[in-house]
Amino acid sequence: MGMPVEFNTLIVTKGKEVRIDENIFTLEKDGYRVYPMEIPMDVRKTKFGEKSGTAEVQKLQWEEGRTIITYKLTSLHSVN
């Protein structure tokens, strides 16, 4: 039996990101997801919303049907 997995090329936060340090955040998502590591990608609050920044995923964890990413915000386009 295969494992369902989703490949993502942008980070959609839906306002659920948690600040760990000045520009380091974690985000927990349902299901197993793959993100490019250490590659700049857009950060958005919603899938079709405006770009709020650019980030690079530094750590990717899978556990109990969830994905946890740790990413570094490299630029901010909006404070709202």
Swiss-Prot record:
Pfam families, per the entry: DUF2584 (PF10763)
This protein's name: Uncharacterized protein YtmB
Encoding gene (name): ytmB
